[in-house]
A protein has these predicted regions:
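WD40-repeat beta-propellers
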Residues: 29-33, 72-75, 114-117, 138, ...
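WD40/WD-repeat beta-propeller blade N-cap
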Residues: 5-6, 44-51, 86-93, 128-135
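A conserved positional marker within WD40/Gbeta-like beta-propeller blades
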Residues: 27-30, 48, 70-71, 90, ...
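Conserved strand-to-loop turn within each blade of WD40 beta-propeller repeats
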Residues: 23-26, 65-69, 107-111, 149-153
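Short loop/turn segments that connect beta-strands within beta-propeller blades
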Residues: 34-37, 77-79, 119-122
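Short coil/turn segments that connect the beta-strands within blades of beta-propeller domains
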Residues: 16-18, 59-61, 101-103, 143-145
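A structural motif specific to WD40 beta-propellers
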Residues: 39-42, 81-84, 123-126
């Protein structure tokens, strides 16, 4: 497993170096390149509510952010340029998780749903109701076949692809 992880890392390693994004309750995010010093390389703005979660795609090309403003934003993972807005949740979005192949992501929300999004088409693929309360956590299985979600309803659900 460790060998596979190292191979994947070497395959996608960016010649520009690793990047870090910090999200904040002042509605902004900053992109940094730690090896280049302490000055941020991009300021990412546009959310109208507190930013709850940010996640780079496994291939490093994209970044998504989830917010209390009920939206998900897609950004260029190298430059920080805004690319697309995803709307569909009716309450705050708490967390997002990428599929291993970077083609899809899933979002978890206060509205008790999960939503599966297609990156290429940039639209909602599936709405996954099933929890009785806010969904706080979501993640993909390493093989991409399942999604796990945890909710305030005290249920852990496993969704099959």
């Amino acid at each position: 497993m460790q060998k596979y992880a190292i191979e994947r890392y070497e395959k996608i390693k960016d010649p520009l170096g690793e990047r870090l994004v910090s999200g904040s309750d002042d509605l902004t995010m900053f992109m940094w390149q730690p090896k280049q010093g302490t000055k941020q390389i991009a300021r990412l703005t546009g959310h109208q509510g507190i930013i709850n979660h940010v996640a780079f795609s496994p291939d490093g090309f994209y970044l998504i952010s989830a917010s209390f403003d009920k939206s998900i934003k897609l950004w260029d993972g190298r430059s920080g340029k805004f690319l697309c807005l995803f709307r569909g949740h009716v309450q705050s979005v708490y967390q997002v998780a990428w599929s291993a192949d970077s083609r899809m992501f899933v979002s978890a929300s206060k509205d008790s749903t999960l939503k599966l999004w297609d990156l290429e088409k940039r639209k909602l693929m599936f709405d996954l109701p099933g929890h009785a309360d806010e969904v706080y956590a979501v993640d993909w299985s390493p093989d991409g076949e399942k999604v796990a979600s945890g909710s305030k309803d005290r249920m852990l659900r496993i969704w099959r692809n």
